[in-house]
């Protein structure tokens, strides 16, 4: 069975298909290795693709040492292949996952490479790549990453929220620093650049998967940082800040969290803005209230320092994007989505639809600080942590059965309930951990939503 973990609450899904389990090529596995002193193992290698059907190119199934993130890069930004990757995990091959092209990039560095998002598959030991739309771009390379978790990834304290003693301003929310997520400062190149002002906050998503646990977040950011600097050739991680799916804020690009550091996140508009990216894919998943609260609190703090109105608009000059030519004036929302400035689906339709809520949250924070009232930062919600996500097992054919391969959660002993879905709609009465497939399921996407609770935690 090809299985992928879905999004939202914990979920898993399969699509019925005739694709057989691929046979691995003979020979040794591709081996990842880490630089001296680094805990991020990596491998970059050329790809040999063969035509499988009209217009479809595919690699062999390649055995590897353990990796958890995969991406594909190439030389020319004008090339736009449709890249799909699947990974072999402990429960078998994943479904094919489309890796979107990274639309974030520096404004003024033509030497950087182009590539897909680095997708979080979790621990895997084989990989296969497919191009559904060719030809293959020049200089195509497979990138595999395995950022190891550290014992102290969840032990580092957050930065304390700062409260101004002068003119009331929106308070700084809790932010985990680069040191706390383990940035190797030797990877970045040159000194940070700062902007004159901050006119906007651009909201992104990393399109890197939604199945990471709280304890895996710092390692995932280290892997993303390694990919941005070593594989794509950027001077640093592209985003000024990141927000994880649990509502925690992390420092991104170096230069000081209180400074207007120039990032590499919104082509054509990096010199007048701050960029924040939510870790995950929000074309698939809806953002939690913890994410919306974190985005609002962060935007309020950064914008209020420059007297910007979170619910307003501003007019800025583009330095050149695929939507606004260099020198063109653009009137945009002060808090906008990446798609407002560039030809991209970022930050995903489900997160984009919540940007008004982010604006309202930021407005309320600023209004409260103006009135001299204390602004309580939203508490991190008590949630059940996903140590190992649930998977789908079984045989994906009519007359056969699927079952939930139960995950591991924090705390131990959390109880799970199930709802099977057909093309996203609940299947009446199917709430057991097993599901028998019928003819009505042929060619349909069958998923299971797994909701796990422990007391008041979900």
Model-derived segments and their meaning:
Residues 376-458:
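Ser/Thr/Pro/Gly-rich low-complexity disordered regions
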Residues 187, 195-231:
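Active-site acidic/histidine clusters and adjacent loop/turn architecture
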Residues 75-80, 124, 134-135, 409-415:
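Short proline/glycine-enriched turn/loop motifs at strand-loop junctions of beta-rich domains
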Residues 9-18, 135, 139-206, 238, ...:
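Basic/polar, cationic surfaces and motifs that engage anionic cell-wall
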Residues 9-42, 370:
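C-terminal region of N-terminal signal peptides and the immediate post-cleavage residues
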Residues 64-70, 80, 198:
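Extended extracellular/luminal ectodomain segments enriched in beta-structured repeat modules
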Residues 1-2:
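N-terminal export leaders
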Residues 8-13, 58-66, 82-84, 89, ...:
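Beta-sandwich interaction modules
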């Amino acid at each position: 069975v090809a299985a992928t973990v879905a999004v939202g609450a914990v979920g898993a899904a399969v699509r019925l298909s005739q694709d057989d389990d691929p046979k691995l090529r003979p020979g040794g596995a591709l081996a990842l290795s880490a630089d001296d002193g680094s805990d991020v193992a990596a491998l970059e290698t050329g790809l040999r693709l063969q035509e499988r059907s009209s217009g479809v190119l595919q690699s062999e199934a390649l055995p590897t040492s353990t990796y958890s993130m995969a991406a594909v890069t190439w030389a020319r930004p004008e090339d736009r292949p449709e890249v799909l990757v699947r990974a072999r995990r402990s429960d078998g091959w994943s479904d094919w996952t489309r890796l979107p092209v990274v639309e974030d990039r520096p404004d003024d560095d033509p030497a950087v490479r182009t590539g897909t998002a680095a997708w979080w598959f979790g621990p895997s030991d084989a990989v296969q790549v497919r191009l559904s739309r060719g030809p293959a771009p020049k200089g195509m390379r497979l990138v595999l990453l395995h950022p190891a978790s550290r014992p102290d990834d969840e032990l580092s304290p957050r930065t304390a929220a700062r409260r101004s003693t002068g003119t009331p301003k929106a308070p700084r929310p809790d932010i985990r620093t680069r040191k706390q997520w383990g940035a190797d400062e030797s990877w970045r190149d040159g000194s940070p650049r700062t902007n004159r002002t901050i006119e906007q906050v651009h909201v992104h998503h990393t399109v890197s998967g939604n199945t990471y646990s709280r304890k895996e977040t710092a390692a995932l950011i280290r892997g993303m940082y390694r990919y941005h600097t070593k594989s794509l050739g950027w001077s640093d991680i592209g985003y000024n800040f990141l927000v994880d799916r649990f509502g925690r804020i992390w420092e991104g690009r170096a230069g000081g969290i209180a400074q207007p550091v120039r990032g590499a996140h919104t082509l054509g508009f990096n010199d007048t803005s701050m960029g924040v990216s939510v870790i995950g894919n929000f074309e698939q998943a809806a953002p939690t209230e913890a994410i919306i609260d974190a985005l609002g609190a962060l935007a309020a703090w950064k914008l209020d320092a420059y007297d910007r109105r979170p619910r307003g608009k501003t007019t800025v000059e583009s330095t050149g994007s695929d939507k606004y030519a260099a020198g063109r004036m653009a009137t945009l929302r002060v808090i906008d989505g990446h798609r407002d400035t560039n030809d991209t689906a970022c930050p995903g339709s489900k997160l984009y639809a919540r940007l008004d809520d982010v604006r309202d949250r930021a407005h309320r924070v600023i209004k409260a600080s103006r009135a001299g009232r204390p602004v309580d930062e939203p508490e991190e919600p008590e949630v059940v942590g996903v140590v190992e996500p649930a998977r789908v097992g079984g045989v994906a054919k009519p007359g056969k059965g699927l079952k939930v391969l139960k995950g591991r959660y924090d705390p131990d002993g959390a109880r799970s309930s199930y709802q099977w879905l057909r093309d996203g709609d609940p299947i009446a009465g199917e709430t057991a951990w097993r599901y028998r497939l019928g003819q009505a399921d042929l060619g349909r996407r069958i998923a299971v939503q797994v909701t796990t609770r422990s007391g008041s935690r979900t």
